[in-house]
């Protein structure tokens, strides 16, 4: 099995972030929808875990697009 390159991982994380932003926006548009809130939270949890693992490995969060406050960016409530 081959290992992912940093560029491939960056691409994958970027796609997940795009879906997460869409999920957060949908949750804002339909407040108090348990499904929409749960979907947004699931993306947040996944990206937060990835971010923490990258931090633990001293990776450049900016390169991977995770140098932001995920809580602020992905909150279903503004």
Task: Name these PLM-found stretches.
Residues 11, 66-78:
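Long, non-catalytic architectural segments outside compact domain cores
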Residues 34-70:
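Short, charge-rich amphipathic interface segments used for partner binding and complex assembly
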Residues 14, 18, 41-48, 75:
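Generic structural signal for well-ordered, non-transmembrane alpha-helical segments
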Residues 1-37:
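N-terminal acidic leader/helix
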